[in-house]
A protein has these predicted regions:
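Terminal-region recognition feature
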Residues: 1-188
Length: 188
């Protein structure tokens, strides 16, 4: 089944230029984000540009640094990007989803959202661990800044409801109440 979904995903990506749709229906990795970045660049450099790009997202999360590379590219796009969430949007996938154009971040009613604190394992010499702690702090600050920009929530509220010690699962309606999306509706 996974192999079939990957083949379907690749077929749609080959045709996305004509339809201005991109499916991110997998783990967030450098490779998957590279494909999305290329799609955004290709569409932005076309003479006859689309008015709106559509990124459909179902993701269990993954590499947060790769996600932020895509987020920065989305922010730099001259073409607004609508994000459409289906099924589950978790962790790094959520960072990408909320970067969509305000007013154009749509969740379907059955979408589950997962937000949690940044996690990372580390080992090494003392100086290496101190460097890791600094990177951990910088990444947490980037996450909070991104949440603030995309939701309008205060840092205190973000830490309470989106980045508490435990994983935070939200329904699509709860996500809308927190400003993570702009609409909850079926795809027509």
């Amino acid at each position: 089944v996974i192999d079939m979904m990957q083949k379907l995903n690749l077929q749609v990506k080959e045709e996305h230029s004509r339809h201005s749709f991109f499916l991110l229906m997998e783990e967030v990795t450098l490779a998957t984000c590279k494909q999305a970045v290329e799609w955004i660049f290709e569409n932005n450099f076309q003479e006859d540009r689309a008015d709106l790009l559509n990124m459909v997202i179902t993701s269990p999360g993954g590499d947060l640094n790769a996600a932020f590379a895509l987020v920065d590219t989305m922010r730099g796009s001259a073409i607004p990007i609508r994000t459409i969430g289906l099924g589950q949007i978790a962790s790094a996938g959520l960072m990408i989803f909320i970067a969509g154009e305000k007013g154009n971040r749509i969740l379907t009613p059955n979408t589950s959202i997962l937000s949690h604190q940044y996690s990372w394992g580390a080992f090494g010499k003392e100086h290496e661990l101190f460097a890791t702690v600094k990177e951990f702090d910088l990444t947490t600050k980037r996450m909070i800044s991104h949440y603030k920009k995309c939701t309008g929530l205060s840092e205190k509220k973000i830490r309470e409801v989106l980045l508490p010690p435990q994983d935070m699962w939200l329904s699509a309606t709860e996500a809308k109440e927190l400003g993570l999306c702009d609409a909850v509706k079926d795809i027509n």
